[in-house]
Amino acid sequence: MESPDLEPQQRTLDDASAEVVSADEVEFDVETDVLVAGAGGCGLTATLAACEAEDLTVTLLEKSAEVGGNAALSTGMIPAAGTRFQREVGIEEGPADMARDILEKNGHEADAELVEHLCESSVDLVHWLVDDWDISLHLVDDFKYPKHSEYRMHAPPGRNGENLVAEMRDRIEARANAELLTNTPVTKLVAKDGAVEGVVAGSVREEAIRADRVILATDGFAGNREMVRAHCEDDIADALYYGSDGNTGDGIRWGAELGGALASMDAFQGHATVVSGTGALSTYAVVMNGGVLVNADGERFGNESKGYSQFAVDVVRQEGGVAYEIFDERIFERLQGALEDFDRAVDLGSYTSADTVEELAAELGCDPEATREAIESYNAAVEAGEPDEVGREDGRNVLSAPFYGTEVTGSLFHTQGGLVVDEHARVLREDGSTVDGLYAGGGTATGISGHGAAGYLSGNGLTTAMGFGRLAGVHAARSLGEQS
């Protein structure tokens, strides 16, 4: 019988508990040195890092048919401060600048030392991907995401995460000491005396795999509505989920069963501009090049430049959970051909155009006169160089005919809380001790976004996914090398 005084967070974890079995009850079928669970941004990076040790075997298991997870659904942009790509265009900044932006966005609610460590390692991460693994990345220097003080996003071709994960997958498949298996979910962790000794995995037929080190890269729990309702704010719990179906909290539950501490379980990344009719993502570059959002009454309802994650909740709170994105031909032409997400949205017929704001609003379904007044007020503030009626000052440009627009809804992308880890991505207990042999990264680990949606800075997801992934892979391989 459930204890009546059990904390709600623990109750949810217990109710949906993933199984951890004793090594005494398992007969292992195969062995590997490093086992990585989950082939998203974190798992792919961890595998690349670990398999650099050529005398080790590395096994990467993915529950879905395709690799990539949420990284494949993202723009694939990796923030890094102090790279040679920045210096080549005259940008002089360092990790401390990136850390400052992250901490200011999350209200200094994240672990400052961990934030600083990830920012310091971001430079090596980008250079390592490009130089050691021939991953195609370039600096994005034509627009900044909200609250980034400098151009520091390093993007794959097309600014599309599918292209990033495809290259990473190809590099792994070319390694003799690495094995990638899809449609192979990890179903249980195997442990003895609090230390991880392997996993049980498989869909049609399960096998027990002995592993000296296990890296949990199963992302968060945004695809598990029960966990979302238990931990995140009500407004987002029933919002559209725009993420990988495999993100059901498995790794978090396994780690917690072994005594791993949890933090920031209420943190998540939302997105304010998923197109209602087509389900396409209307890139936030539309907004940061001057686009605005109004509600059904034709009124601006908040400062869009505070970020697509935080603004997602504002959109969900509008009538019908929708808003209307208004921009112009200048923005349309600037983004077409530059971002694959935008091109996909265009190809799906996501956008409507008209010669006047009133005509556009009438077609979209928001109040024509009020929308015209909102755009006129916005333009006047831009021309005067003053904050507009919602306090926005960033990413503004005068909007002029012809106009474009679409109906959008707020969505949940992924959660940002999970297992507490150290600077090597090792899972920690409440007393600060490590769970032997166990690592976590990405959405499986505590993120750097503080609480709720407001603390998410663009790129935080891949910062923790790929940053912790590399740290975990390097440490796992190095620690095994020291034992040999």
Outline where the language-model segments fall.
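Extreme N-terminal leader/targeting segments of oxidoreductases
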Residues: 1-34, 52-53, 481-482
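Glycine-rich FAD pyrophosphate-binding loop
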Residues: 53-73
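An anion/pyrophosphate-binding glycine-rich loop and adjacent beta-alpha core
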Residues: 252-254, 260-366
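A glycine-rich dinucleotide-binding beta-alpha-beta segment and adjacent secondary-structure elements
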Residues: 188, 370-452
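Core beta-strand elements of the Rossmann-like FAD/NAD(P) dinucleotide-binding domain
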Residues: 28-32, 204-213
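Conserved redox-cofactor binding core of oxidoreductases
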Residues: 11-12, 16, 118-208, 223-227, ...
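Glycine-rich loop(s) and the adjacent beta-strand/alpha-helix scaffold that form part
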Residues: 209-273, 462-465, 471
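N-terminal Rossmann-like FAD-binding beta1-loop-alpha1 element of flavoenzymes
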Residues: 32-60
